[in-house]
Amino acid sequence: MSTNQETRGFQSEVKQLLQLMIHSLYSNKEIFLRELISNASDAADKLRFKALSAPELYEGDGDLKVRISFDAEKGTLTISDNGIGMTREQVIDHLGTIAKSGTKEFLAALGQEQAKDSQLIGQFGVGFYSAFIVADKVTVKTRAAGEPIDRAVLWESAGEGEYSVADIEKRERGTEITLHLREEEKEFANEWRVREIIGKYSDHIGLPVEILAKEYDEEGKETGIKWEKINKAQALWTRSKGEISDEEYKEFYKHLSHDFADPLLWTHNKVEGNQEYTSLLYVPSKAPWDLFNREHKHGLKLYVQRVFIMDDAEQFMPNYLRFMRGLIDSNDLPLNVSREILQDNKVTAALRKALTKRSLQMLEKLAKDDEEKYLQFWKEFGLVLKEGPSEDFANKENIAKLLRFASSKNDSSEQTVSLEDYVARMKEGQKAIYYITADSYIAAKNSPHLELFNKKDIEVLLLSDRIDEWMLSYLTEFDGKQLQPITKADLDLGDLADKEQEEQKEQDKTFSSFIERVKTLLGERVKDVRLTHRLTDTPAVVSTDNDQMTTQMAKLFAAAGQPVPEVKYTFELNPEHHLVKKVADFADEDEFANWIELLLEQAMLAERGSLENPTAFIKRVNNLLG
């Protein structure tokens, strides 16, 4: 008998997600059982953890398990566990809403085609809601550990916008989920179909999964039914690597992460000695949609002596490796460990150092052994890895080896060139690694600063991600070579400089009065005016000194709402260009001023991508064209 019944509406995001999920995951519908068994396993883990300090929560039943039964006539499938259970408030919070930050924005941004992508929807960890793929009604009965028998909860919904919740009596602790299968999904009320799915998806979890199976005598006659354990029920990471198949590793990843896609790669290690722990680390094949959300939960599952302690233990991985998934099972941490204790703990620090090293080694090996697969990783997680040099000084060189960039040598925006590739191709006498940062690949590729380098066939790395300038303020050298921006006024090409410099000096003398005239005109608006011989097709550029903030860094500061120091540019004019020669001969001061202003505005536009007064620029161009 139920009491205190009420009907409530789903949060709008839940309604939207249910519809998207039912349509996008239908072709892979059997995963609902994996999701529900995973949830049951998590509930058991949480009970074990709470019972460390409150053993009475076991209520005399510490034999944790998942049980699956079905009724072919009624067309129902029931998954029950004796784990932690839920209170009424938790039922409403967990089954009626999605608390994930950014959910509304994510769903709003989903296009019709994207909505059909099961991997995209699967990133959500849809868990419980996957039941509605095969059921037209779902009934949940649950009682939280430690709650009295009459404080259990009944939850029911047809998945169409509302659900009901009521108080009931339930003797057994834990959660029981009954799926009222759609007419066309009655195959899931079949013992052998259920056995097949569990063998495929859930054989590896550490909790016994039992099925209510028929018993037969020697003649094959049915004699009754009994609960039969049908999985190995041994935590996968505790088994030896040699006896675990790739398929088992992949399915365990999906159980662990609730991801629908296979992982890209993994590493499984057991360490003994000063520290004793087992780690199983995965690199996903796809980045989660909220990877750059500040509230994005990340980190490893933490076990101590095979007892689950917590999800999302971020203390074991640096932030730039937040895409890593997996678990660590330590023998050295106390069972009563908390997030606060983990924060300032020598064991945690040692484990973090070891796991970071292990992760970077795994990526380095992938880059060496399978370039195509590594570039697949880079497309998904390269931006995050670029945060590394600013966060992890100790591993800066190793992170640098993993970075990939676009290059002036490739006619493509694809980031495929490593710093090691670049160094191996450096010209004889070249002492620096040259790069340019810009708002986009196109802007970098067509920058006038590249003209001299193209002429001399010197490779330049083309950087256009917002984080690049920040990263390079920490990554200033590689393999003993300085990383040098080509946009600096005092660019030093060393032994690669023109041998005809003496001739240029003589030529420059003839323009000395012209330069003084430009300086007088522009005054304090520029830091300096000089001639340049690094341009071939462009009349003028602007550049910054080594001790000045670059244009891209200034933009980064401005975008972050930080105060930006004034950047004064050096105005460089190409004496070989016909326009500069023409302007140098103008006697009329107004005409001279108009053309110099135009050349400066053009140079500023090429450098910054915008002008403070574009209307004046357009007016000037129109006047000169007229």
From Swiss-Prot:
Keywords: ATP-binding, Chaperone, Cytoplasm, Nucleotide-binding, Stress response
GO molecular function: ATP binding; ATP hydrolysis activity; ATP-dependent protein folding chaperone; unfolded protein binding
GO cellular component, one term: cytoplasm
Annotated region described as B, given as residue ranges: 340-555
Region (C): 556-626
Family under the similarity heading: Belongs to the heat shock protein 90 family.
Database matches in NCBIfam families: PRK05218.1
Official protein name in the record: Chaperone protein HtpG
Encoding gene, per UniProt annotation: htpG
